[in-house]
Amino acid sequence: MLYIEPYPDPQRECERVSNVLAQELIEAGVHFGHRASRWNPKMRPYIHGRKNLIHIIDVRETIRGLLRARKYLKQVASTGSLVLFVGTKRQGAEAIAREAGRCGMPYVSDRWLGGTLTNFRTIRNRLARLEELEVLIPSEAFGAYSKKMQSSLRREHRKMLRNLGGIRTLSRLPECLVVFDPKKEKNAINEARKMGITTVALIDTDCDPDLVDLPIPGNDDSIRSIELVAARLADAILEGKAETAVESQAAAEGAEGGEGAEGKPKPKARPMVAKRSVPKPKA
C-alpha cells in the first residue's frame, strides 16, 4: 500500500521554523543589547526587558524583522538587481565580505568612501583606474617605469584594492543596502536615503530604527550574531537568483518548443517595501 506523507500544517510548520530560528538566534547571542544607559528610546518596542544593566532584545521581533528582510531581498535578487552589503566593524568585516561574496553581491568591509552612492560616476572612474593598474602591473611595460614610480603605482593599487575591491562589481546603483550597525555606518545610510535606496539593517538598542526601512533588531557587536544574520540574508539572495535561473531555463525550453514570444519570461516589477508596522511598546 502506497503511503503518502501528509502535507505539513502551514501554521505548525511556521511555528516550527520560528522555534528553530529563535534557538539559533539565542545561541548566537543576538538578543543581547547594549547597556541600558546607552539605549535609544525609539528601540523600546523591540526590547524584551533588562538584565544586569543590559537590555535584552525581544527575539520574536528579531525573527519578524529577519523574515521580512529575507522576503524583500529574495524579491530584489529575483529581478537581477544589486544588493550592497556594508559593515566596517573589525569583528564582522570578514564574515560580511565572505557572505556577500558567496551570494555574488558587492560589499564594503573596510571603509565607506564618501560619495559611493551620491557621486557614483567618480567611484566608477576610480574602479576603471583600478582595472587599469591591474593590467599594467603584471605587464612587461611596467618594467620601463623607474623603481620609484613602480613603488608608487603598487602602493596606489594596494590602497585602491583595499577601499574598492569589494565594490568592483558595482556596475550600477544598488537597489538595496544591507547594513550592520547603522549608527557606525551613518554616512552610508544618509547617502542611501538621499538616493532613495532601500535599507535593511541589523540594529542594536542604541540605534534609531526610523532611519532604516527594514530593521532587524539584534546584537550588532557579536561576531556570531553578525555571521548568522549575514548568512541568512545571503541565503535569501541565492534563493531569489535560483528562482530567476529556473524561470529563464523554462522560458528558453518553451521558446525551443515553438512557443515563440509566449515563452519569454515576463519582466518583474521593482520590489516594493511594505509599510512597517512598529510593535506597541511593552509595559
Feature roles, as predicted:
Residues 31, 89-92, 112-118, 182-186, ...:
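Conserved nucleotide-binding/hydrolysis micro-motifs of P-loop NTPases
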Residues 83-84, 106-109, 178, 198-202, ...:
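Short hydrophobic alpha-helical runs that function as membrane-insertion/retention elements
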Residues 187-191, 195-247:
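Short glycine/threonine-rich loop/turn motifs
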Residues 147-179, 183-200, 204:
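Extended, charged alpha-helical interaction scaffolds
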Residues 29, 85, 177, 229:
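Residue-level signature of catalytic and energy-coupling elements of molecular machines
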Residues 3, 11-81, 88-89, 93-136, ...:
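N-terminal cationic and glycine-rich segments that engage phosphates or anionic surfaces
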Residues 2-8, 190-194:
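Post-transcriptional modification and biogenesis factors for structured RNAs
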